[in-house]
Amino acid sequence: MKKVIAITGPTASGKTSLSIKIAKKFNLEIINCDSLQMYQKYDIGTAKITLEEAQGIKHHLLDFLAPGTNYSIYHFQKDARKKIEETPLPLFVGGSGLYLKSALFDYELTPKSLFLPPTSLPAIENMIDFIKQKDPQLIANLDLKNPRRILSAYQDLLEGTLRSQKNKKHNSLYSSLIFYLDIDRQILKKRVILRLEQMLKQGFIEEVNQIQTHFPNPNFNIIGYREIKALLEGKITLDQAKTLIIQKTMQYAKRQKTWFKNQIKPIILDALSPDLEKTTICLINDFLKTD
C-alpha cells in the first residue's frame, strides 16, 4: 500500500514551517490541501507560502486556479490521487479536512450533486447543521443568508455521504501517517491577531480590492475576505472587520480540531514543543520502516 504523510492543523499553528523542514529532510514533494490556497491572487489573506519560504521544495495543487474558477472537492480528489501516484512519497499540507479525507479514503464522488426534489429537502436549519458536522471549513465560509448556496453545499456533501455509506467506504486507500498540530487556544488567538496585523501591513485590503476589480464573481465567502469586502463597501469599520475575522477564525479552529479528531484520528502533536521537529522525524522514520 502506498505511503502518504500529512501535516494538518489550524491556521498559525506552524504547518508551513514544519512541512518545509520535513520535506527537506526526507526529500518530499508537497501536495497542498488548503482549498483556498489553490486560487491565484488569494495570497496574503490565505497566508500562502512564498517562493522564499518554499526553499525550492516542489508544491502541487497550489496557486493554480484563477479566481472564480469552479473547482470542487470532486476535482481535487481526482487531481490529488493522480499526484499521489506520480510522487514517490507525497506530503499533504493544509487544514481542509474534507479535501484530505476525500483524497485518502475510499469516497466515491461525482461532478454533479444529487438531484433532490423540493419535497424531500430538510429545513434550511437542518441543512446547516448537517454541513457543520461534515465540513467545518465549508460552514465557516458559507453565506448562511443565501439559501441557494446552502442547498448546493448540502447536496454536494450529501452525495458523498450517501455514496460512502452505500458502498461501505471510509477505508483508507493508502498507508497514511497524519499529524495534527495542536496549540493552546489563548496562544493561538495571539498568533491569529499578530498574523492579521501582518496581513494588513502586507496589503490584505488592497488584495481584496484588486481581486474584486479584475475578476468577475470572485469567491469572497471566506473568513477574512468576506469581512474586508464589507469594509471596502463601507458596511463595517476596520476595527469591526478585525474583530469579526479573529472571532470567526477561532470558531473555525475549534470546529476544525473536533472534526479532525473524530473523522481522521490523526497523531496529535504539540505545535509549541521544542522537540516538535525531532518527534515528527522519529515518527516518520518508524512509519517508513513498516511494510
Curated annotation (Swiss-Prot):
Protein's name according to its UniProt entry: tRNA dimethylallyltransferase
Catalyzed chemical reaction(s): adenosine(37) in tRNA + dimethylallyl diphosphate = N(6)-dimethylallyladenosine(37) in tRNA + diphosphate
Domain of life the protein comes from: Bacteria
Region described as Interaction with substrate tRNA: spans on this chain: 34-37
Database matches in InterPro entries: Dimethylallyltransferase, IPT, P-loop_NTPase
Binding positions (ATP): G9, P10, T11, A12, S13, G14, K15, T16
UniProt entry tagged with the keyword Transferase: yes
Enzyme class: transferase
Record-linked PANTHER family: TRNA DIMETHYLALLYLTRANSFERASE
Keywords: ATP-binding, Magnesium, Nucleotide-binding, Transferase, tRNA processing
Site keyed Interaction with substrate tRNA: positions: S96
GO biological process: tRNA modification
NCBIfam families listed in its UniProt record: miaA (TIGR00174)
Binding site for substrate: T11, A12, S13, G14, K15, T16
Leader peptide range in chain numbering: none
EC number, UniProt record: 2.5.1.75
The organism of origin for this protein: Onion yellows phytoplasma (strain OY-M)
Reported function: Catalyzes the transfer of a dimethylallyl group onto the adenine at position 37 in tRNAs that read codons beginning with uridine, leading to the formation of N6-(dimethylallyl)adenosine (i(6)A).
Subunit structure: Monomer.
An example molecular function term from Gene Ontology annotations: ATP binding
Cofactor: Mg(2+)
Family: Belongs to the IPP transferase family.
